[in-house]
Amino acid sequence: AAQSLLATYIKLNVNRYQQGQPLTLPVHVADAFRAILLDENIDPALAAEILTLPSATEIAELFDIIDPIAIVAVREALTRTLATELADEFLAIYNANKLDAYRVEHADIGKRSLRNTCLRYLAFGEAELANTLVSKQYHEADNMTDALAALAASVAAELPCRDARSEEHT
């Protein structure tokens, strides 16, 4: 249901972008994301999936005629809007899901996934905090999942630390 709701607003915003109109995200969409973030009964892995915006490729499948520039612009704008609207919630969930040691267990995998989803949104939020969180996670990562999530977040959000992270990773 959440993905269907998102698809509707993504299509609407791609059309608005193409017409030079301002993009919109109704309050109830952010509220739905907030409810997922704060619901302690949802498996963290499932929450991470629900909170992840569709990829540009998935969005392109919604259209007969594909406008990649509009799709990327809308996806980034929605990410930034959600990052701003839910900054406190993303940060709280990010911090609450820090693990002491790497273990290959379902519960830990889910927490890592949710934490990394939150990091990606946080990367599109307040720049100084984003740069600090991403750099810290990259340097403290004891597994490839967390290191790559930090690297991907820095690149996607075009953070100042992205070049250093990319050089360190190669």
Region locations from a protein language model:
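Long, ordered, helix-rich scaffold segments
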Residues: 2-167
